[in-house]
Amino acid sequence: MNTIQVAGVETTPSKIVCVGRNYVAHIEELGNEVPEQMVVFGKPNSAIGNKLQAFHGGEPLHYEGEIALAISNGRATAAGFGLDLTKRTLQGQLKKKGLPWERAKAFDLSLIHI
């Protein structure tokens, strides 16, 4: 299992919960509609990494800076910064078919912590 440092303590996140489509300028840039409710998706522990890669499985990756919170017992215990990596071409193909786009967001090393 991958770990992160939270307040100097090595921690193994049990799950990673992400909120998508929360930045209007980026929503418009991608030609998406602003959702009425927040879009939530998950990433597995294997998504955590610390080396930025430009490609995954031959596909170029897009990145977005994200504010990250560590939550324990219902409380935010730390804040940090990370990069959310996306297989944008695959995501577009899945969205056109009305399929979940988890494969484009939740692959190994798709969440870079800094």
Feature locations, PLM:
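Catalytic-core "active-site belt" of small-molecule-metabolizing enzymes
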Residues: 1-113
